[in-house]
Amino acid sequence: MKNRGGGGIANHPQVQGKRYPNCRQFDVLELCFEEWLLGQVSVHTSHPNSLSFSPGMKPSIEEVGHASLFPNSTTRLFSAARGGFGNPAPARPTAGLVGPIEMAAPLIAIVGPTAAGKSALALAVAASLDGEIVNYDSVQLYRGFDIGSGKLSRQERCGIPHHLLDCLDAEEQFTAGDYRREALSVLAEIRARTRLPVFVGGTGLYLRAVFMGLFDGPPRSEELRRRLRGLAERRGREFLHRLLKRLDAAAAARIQPRDTQKAVRALEVCILARTPISKMQARGRSGLEGYRVVKVGLNPERKELCQRIDKRVEEMFARGLLEETRALRARRDWSRFKALGALGYRQASAVVQGQLGLPEAVLETQVATRRYAKRQMTWFRHEAGIVWFDGFGDDPRVQSQVIDFLRETGITVRCSGAL
């Protein structure tokens, strides 16, 4: 980090009072950040231009963010593009739909466990009711993750428009909040064409984010996240949980001590918003307005579902999952590909690295996928308003039952938006 005008943080008199021998300016910033999180530094603000450090006391978020400690904007602790430490985060766009809402428009969501035939049912519904499909599977968002995610090929999509599919580069980070914003934009476009949106996928959190909304937290800061992950690597994953407990005990109580991802986000919100994340979550969420949501659930027989899962996994490896994984890992930035930790890709990576044999990888993927399907059903059974249909989505009889049900509810071809 360059020192531009005014001497920078390394020459600041309050920092000079600490013992940081042989530290570059960047190192000093890291040390200041870590000491603040540890609660070993206190910043006194009796006068806005006279700050001092003293060990043993925990400063408030507002005090540590005081701009006079970092007089040059280029040398503040965080300078993320959309807000950072010491700078109030800019207001997020209000979640909602583009344009005025006059009458409720229909929206279909197909839910159920993996390998239940949700994609086949979505195609049948979209074809019969003039719909467009919106993906809510977190892995299918990424380009290059095709075989392991069960992504339909262009030919298999039967000419029906698909959205939020192959829309991200492998290294891009994507949150439930990001998904909600993109999905709302897609919904507005589909509505403008007077067509029926049909959501299909397996990431229940994404669907919940669209329908129920998320708390209005600050945008993520990659710089802050990098620093927090660095602390976890140096001091262990439980370390972040202990820090969070100091700032927001209520949030820490809901997060497992070794869940680094959730701890990082909770700390990020506490720091950037200068408010405990638990308080922000308690303020409520803004749900989806202007749509009549119909949720259709597939409830396949458990034994047959497990058989289908086992067969699908075998077919994935036979179709080239190892080669797809090897190609992804051959890229220079492969370590940043979050989706490589997904089911199938994780086991295939172990084979590529020589840590697992192929038969063991297939079996491990089958067992893990069966458990995942069970968790999916548990998740969706806690969701309100789902109409369940016994069977698989690729069964023509089930497809007819679902389409007849949707028509009976008033959803017809070329929905005008009024029901």
Predicted regions and their residues:
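Hydrophobic alpha-helical signal/anchor motif
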Residues: M1, I9, V15, V28, ...
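Phosphate/pyrophosphate-binding catalytic cores of soluble transferases and nucleic-acid-acting enzymes
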Residues: F78-S79, L97-L419
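Residue-identity detector for glycine
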Residues: G5-G8, G17, G39, G56, ...
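Short linear segments in intrinsically disordered or otherwise low-structure-confidence regions
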Residues: Q40, E62, F70, T75-R76, ...
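Short linear motifs in low-complexity or flexible loops
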Residues: A10, P21, T45-P48
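Short hydrophobic alpha-helical segments enriched in small aliphatic residues
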Residues: T45-P48, A67, G86
